[in-house]
Amino acid sequence: MDFASSKKRKFKDANGVKPSKGKKSSSIPDKKSKKVKRAEPEPHDEPEDDSSDEEEQALKEVEDESDQADEDVEAANSAEEEEEEGGDEDNAENNTDLPNGGQLTLPPVAGAEAQSFEELKLSEKTMKAINEMKFTKMTEIQRRGIPPSLAGRDVLGAAKTGSGKTLAFLIPVIEMLSSLRFKPRNGTGVIVVSPTRELALQIFGVARELMAHHSQTYGIVIGGANRRAEAEKLAKGVNLLIATPGRLLDHLQNTPFVFKNLKSLVIDEADRILEIGFEDEMRQIIKVLPKEDRQTMLFSATQTTKVEDLARISLRPGPLYINVDEEKQYSTVEGLEQGYIICETDMRFLLLFSFLKRNLKKKIIVFFSSCACVKYHAELLNYIDLPVLDLHGKQKQQKRTNTFFEFCNAKQGTLICTDVAARGLDIPSVDWIIQFDPPDDPRDYIHRVGRTARGSNNKGRSLMFLQPNELGFLSHLKAARVPVAEFNFPTKKIINVQSQLEKLISQNYYLNKSAKDGYRSYMHAYASHSLRSVFDINKLDLAKVAKSFGFTQPPRVDITLGASMSRDKKQQGRRAYGSQPRQNQGNKFTR
């Protein structure tokens, strides 16, 4: 039997699922097949990044930590495996079944009245990690979610951002892995699916701390990372796996690894996963994964029709529904001071520049509507000696990872970004959230401002820029139980650098090109806004918009409304706000 067919047979034996036909297998040779050359896997969701060593440094740190965890586990488990298997190493390597047939025997758990982690009667190893992380009292989602999850219940949870749900799902699954004595050879027992790479990295970091004293393995697979290295680790055995949907489906279909023992599936930020176009991938993932005795926990900030459909196919009948926000007066967290400022279109950049200059010692996140807008403003601000970091979806993964951790570790500074940073990310000590471009609807607003005032005793402030024609958005925020007040920024305190800006843009070829791209993308984003009754492109003064980008006259760019319909397709079916996308009207605003 040749090597490829033997690996397919081994994969089938381990999981009862055949590798996808017509694609190369990213198989990892076993110890008896060292001389056989490995087949290169074909990327499924994003191409592998083969850029410079400097760009790979950020992800390398995560990979090194995962490698070290694997080494520690192998050393810790070697004696136990010899004892349990009677010293038969070959049998231990090939036997992927769980001890005791995978029967879960967790200690009695505390009821909903438990207030502290101590009352949950968790394992000594988990409690030691929680104490080292300085957690004592539970948040509401933890108090209501952890006990039933420890008991094996399926959970459908709704909680606002910053509520502590990461611990709410990680603690129960780690306890389960420990109770079942999972080892690398048993394969993957828990999969956590996250919408974005940054959120997946963040969950991975929390899992690493919680599992510091446990012997089980953990790992992460995300788009843009080294797929071959991921496949090798999966073949060795990753008990707790954090993943983004596209890369997870890729490995499930093309990488031979053991997942027949899967006991728990966690879907975090389910509404966001569906919003960004991973509905088909999630359906395929759920279809491939074992269903028998599998616990599923699904968390979503909003309960849309698509989320309900996903819950229906993934959860067992009679799940526990937890909504910690239904009785709250406001949809945003306490300790958050929220406001807006009315600003003429041509003054928007000057106001932003003046605000950032006055708050150089603060930690600030500024949200823009498109990648090109982020790129232009980052290049411009850094060029004029106002240092900022930038984060958006068109960057290479190494760059995104490096920027994310650099800003997390910074005590002060400014990050300008798209909504890639708006969901779930726990960035410490953010003082201000600036929404330079308006969000697509109140739900996105809530997630943006959720990057500050996180935790039980933290404070934070947010500021939204609104043009005079956009004030109708305030009524939508009010309907969504979001309290905002008008802020004033004295005109005399605005630093007028308009003439210098226009001179710079006219003379610097690269900034001019970047400004033109930003202008075009801003108009496209505005044209495809879901709340078109409020954000009407026909009401924009294009001369003022151009001026805010540093042009004396609107540049000659095609900003056909129909050109933005690809973005509309991503929005359709997920928005409860605003009108349906318009048909291609063929209107052009070309200068």
From Swiss-Prot:
Per the record, the major location class is: nucleus
Q: Where is this region: Disordered?
A: 1-108, 560-591
Q: Where is this motif: Q motif?
A: 115-143
Domain Helicase ATP-binding: where?
Answer: 146-321
Q: Source organism's superkingdom?
A: Eukaryota
Keywords in alphabetical order, please: ATP-binding, Helicase, Hydrolase, Nucleotide-binding, Nucleus, Ribosome biogenesis, RNA-binding, rRNA processing
Which compartments does it reside in?
A: Nucleus, Nucleolus
A Gene Ontology MF term for this entry? ATP binding
Q: Which residues form the Helicase C-terminal domain?
A: 335-495
Q: Where is this motif: DEAD box?
A: 268-271
Q: Please give the catalytic activity noted in the UniProt record.
A: ATP + H2O = ADP + phosphate + H(+)
Q: What is its EC number?
A: 3.6.4.13
Q: Which residues form a coiled coil?
A: none
Tell me where the sequence motif Bipartite nuclear localization signal sits in this chain.
Answer: 347-363
Purpose of the protein:
ATP-dependent RNA helicase involved in 40S ribosomal subunit biogenesis. Required for the processing and cleavage of 35S pre-rRNA at sites A0, A1, and A2, leading to mature 18S rRNA.
User: Subunit composition?
Assistant: Associates in the nucleolus with the 60S and pre-60S ribosomal subunits.
* Name of the molecule in the record: ATP-dependent RNA helicase HAS1
Organism (species): Gibberella zeae (strain ATCC MYA-4620 / CBS 123657 / FGSC 9075 / NRRL 31084 / PH-1)
